[in-house]
A protein has these predicted regions:
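Acidic, polar-rich low-complexity tracts and alpha-helical solenoid repeat scaffolds
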Residues: 1-323
Length: 323
């Protein structure tokens, strides 16, 4: 990897031991006197940071942050392909064009169809309800008093779906009522487990305005570890472990927050922070064993060098701020 500003370096000597590299060089810049320079760097750490910057330049969100939702969309699309072949296509359009009125109308119509089908099909009911929930999360309005949206909300409220106005976000947000219902009524089913994973992914809090408090990571850890203890071989264990690892990483990072941080007081998170870092490392390694490729493993490989060195990672995945 070429060092920034190294065009004028001369007499370069390098020493390398495992991941650590030390570079001694003479710099003769075009203007100013020559000087002896010393550079030390951790190769794995530098590579991870560089890859992260490149990724953030090309995506609105890291793929790892959307992994659970993406996986769920794929699974639901396969399960319901025969009866609802356009489900995944419409879901993708809703993600890309969240305020398009034509897309919103189609999303609303399909949510109603899914809810109707769920009432008639006992065997597929959990999957149909989960599909309706996942699609309904892309249904809303930026107009607080829209008559059309008000009529849609009233119709969907009959099936237990509710939306709440976010003053800060200036939009209506779905409360994921169906997720809670599925997890309560079908906890032993594969789709009940998928609802559980999605609730973890949402910080175990589907309210507007962090109503359950800012420290979502604590409940994600509690719920996730209890799930893994009861169901160590669950098909969803990789997702649960990844979310638990991110929760421990969040705890560690909050304990290392700057004193000037407007939202996180590092003093509040010191108790247990070292253990949280160690557990984050251990669980991320478990994730690498379960999912060797893809967004979670890519993320784990990038963050492990920093955690291993005891550096803050600025992870705030499960720290809720409403401001």
């Amino acid at each position: 990897m070429r060092e920034f500003g190294s065009a004028s370096w001369r007499d370069i000597v390098r020493w390398r031991a495992n991941a650590l590299e030390i570079v001694l060089y003479m710099d003769a810049p075009p203007s100013g006197p020559s000087y002896l320079g010393l550079l030390a760097r951790h190769i794995a750490l530098l590579t991870a940071i560089t890859e992260e910057w490149r990724e953030l330049e090309t995506s609105r969100m890291p793929p790892s942050a959307e992994w659970v939702a993406t996986q769920l969309a794929v699974l639901l699309g396969k399960e319901l392909h025969t009866a609802f072949p356009d489900y995944r296509t419409l879901l993708a359009r809703a993600v890309e064009n969240p305020t398009d009125s034509a897309v919103q109308a189609k999303v609303y119509a399909l949510v109603l169809e899914l809810l109707k089908a769920a009432k008639a099909h006992n065997a597929q009911r959990p999957a149909l309800l989960l599909a309706a929930d996942h699609l309904a999360s892309h249904l809303g309005s930026q107009d607080e008093r829209s008559p059309e949206w008000d009529a849609r909300r009233r119709a969907l409220r009959i099936d237990g779906l509710t939306w709440h106005w976010s003053q800060l976000g200036a939009s209506w947000f779905y409360a994921h009522d169906l997720l809670w219902r599925i997890w309560k009524e079908y906890p032993a089913s594969p789709w009940g487990e998928r609802a559980f994973v999605r609730l973890l992914d949402l910080g175990w809090d589907t309210s507007v305005g962090c109503q359950k408090g800012s420290d979502q990571f604590r409940e994600v850890i509690r719920q996730g570890e209890a799930f893994l203890a009861r169901r160590p071989m669950s098909p969803a264990r990789a997702e649960v472990k990844f979310l638990v690892a991110q929760s421990y990483e969040t705890w560690w990072s909050l304990s290392q927050a700057s004193r000037e941080d407007q939202y996180a007081d590092p003093a509040r998170y010191q108790d247990g922070a070292t253990t949280a870092r160690q557990k984050a490392i251990a669980v991320y390694k478990d994730v690498l064993g379960l999912v060797p490729t893809g967004p979670p493993s890519t993320y784990a490989r990038r963050v492990l060098p920093r955690l291993g060195l005891g550096f803050p990672t600025n992870q705030r995945r499960f720290f809720c701020v409403y401001d």
